[in-house]
Amino acid sequence: MKHLIFSSALVCALVVCTFAEEQVNVPFLPDERAVKCIGWQETCNGNLPCCNECVMCECNIMGQNCRCNHPKATNECESRRR
């Protein structure tokens, strides 16, 4: 009986942790969007090729996928990336 209760508690904890992990999705704040060159180097660490042409780039938590919100018009951000 103890094993059944322990197993049930473990499964419930795992489900709660998995659900909480999926809810972590913090978008850019409105005041961050107004600042040039923010987002892609801080959110994506400037190391992802898919963010090279972006002023603001959002990544997933693993840093494998990104979405360019505002393409660069010039190379004004290039020096900040280094």
From Swiss-Prot:
Q: How is it modified after translation?
A: Plectoxin-5 presumably undergoes post-translational modification to give rise to plectoxin-6.
Q: Which GO terms describe its cellular component?
A: extracellular region
**Signal sequence, start to end:** 1-20
Q: In which tissues is it expressed?
A: Expressed by the venom gland.
Altering F19S: what's the impact? In clones PSCI268, PSCI270 and PSCI272
Q: What is this protein called?
A: U1-plectoxin-Pt1a
Localization per Swiss-Prot or TrEMBL:
Secreted
Q: What does this protein do?
A: Potent toxin that may paralyze and/or kill insect pests such as H.virescens (lepidoptera), S.exigua (beet armyworm) and M.sexta (tobacco hornworm).
Which cysteines are disulphide-bonded?
A: C37-C51, C44-C57, C50-C68, C54-C77, C59-C66
Q: Give the matching InterPro entries.
A: Spidertoxin
Record keyword Lipoprotein present: yes
Propeptide residues, chain positions: 21-33, 80-82
**GO MF entry, a single one:** ion channel inhibitor activity
Task: Name the species this protein comes from.
Answer: Plectreurys tristis (Spider)
Q: Where is the lipid attached (O-palmitoyl serine)?
A: S79
Q: What is its main location?
A: secreted
Domain comment from the record reads as follows: The presence of a 'disulfide through disulfide knot' structurally defines this protein as a knottin.
